[in-house]
Amino acid sequence: MGVDIRHNKDRKVRRKEPKSQDIYLRLLVKLYRFLARRTNSTFNQVVLKRLFMSRTNRPPLSLSRMIRKMKLPGRENKTAVVVGTVTDDVRILEVPKLKVCALRVSSRARSRILKAGGKILTFDQLALESPKGRGTVLLSGPRKGREVYRHFGKAPGTPHSHTKPYVRSKGRKFERARGRRASRGYKN
């Protein structure tokens, strides 16, 4: 008698299309599917893969981070490409002239980029301008920037753990005594 093979781990889990039913996103996917197939550029394949991603994997990119990344040597006069949202940052006073391509740009960020003499493209315009992704810099927001990541990692209360505990409130009586001070049991 043969042994049955476990087939539960056979399937490769990855997105082949976006979960969203947004017709405009679907049109972009159609366009970049074509470009990824017909051009030999990795840029189009990466953009296509990112168009499929969930919102948590397409975190917003702040204007300040984009400016910092575009100031690096060799990135002058290049287009910043973000498969996601570009948001404003009030801490930045001077916005340089930028050429940006993004899925969405918040209204304040949009007005500030345009006021500085910059240009904002959509992905279909980018496909016409540089179908192979030449002269572009692909950027993305901080994926681990969400508050929820502070709760992940070594269990809170164990030595050298900086993990944030899920606490009802931040009062004197909550997770402040035992394990936190030597006079109350022990200190981690």
From Swiss-Prot:
Residues with Phosphoserine modification: 130
Main location: cytoplasm
Cellular component terms (Gene Ontology): cytoplasm; cytosol; cytosolic large ribosomal subunit; rough endoplasmic reticulum
UniProtKB keywords: Cytoplasm, Endoplasmic reticulum, Isopeptide bond, Phosphoprotein, Ribonucleoprotein, Ribosomal protein, Ubl conjugation
GO molecular function: structural constituent of ribosome
Modified residues (Phosphothreonine): 158
GO biological process: cytoplasmic translation
SUPFAM superfamilies in the cross-refs: Ribosomal proteins L15p and L18e
Comp. bias regions, Basic residues: 161-171, 178-188
UniProt cross-references to Pfam families, sorted A to Z: Ribosomal_L18
InterPro entries tied to this protein: Ribosomal_eL18, Ribosomal_eL18/eL18-A/B/_CS, Ribosomal_uL15/eL18, Ribosomal_uL15/eL18_sf
Family under the similarity heading: Belongs to the eukaryotic ribosomal protein eL18 family.
Protein name according to UniProt: Large ribosomal subunit protein eL18
Annotated organism of origin: Mus musculus (Mouse)
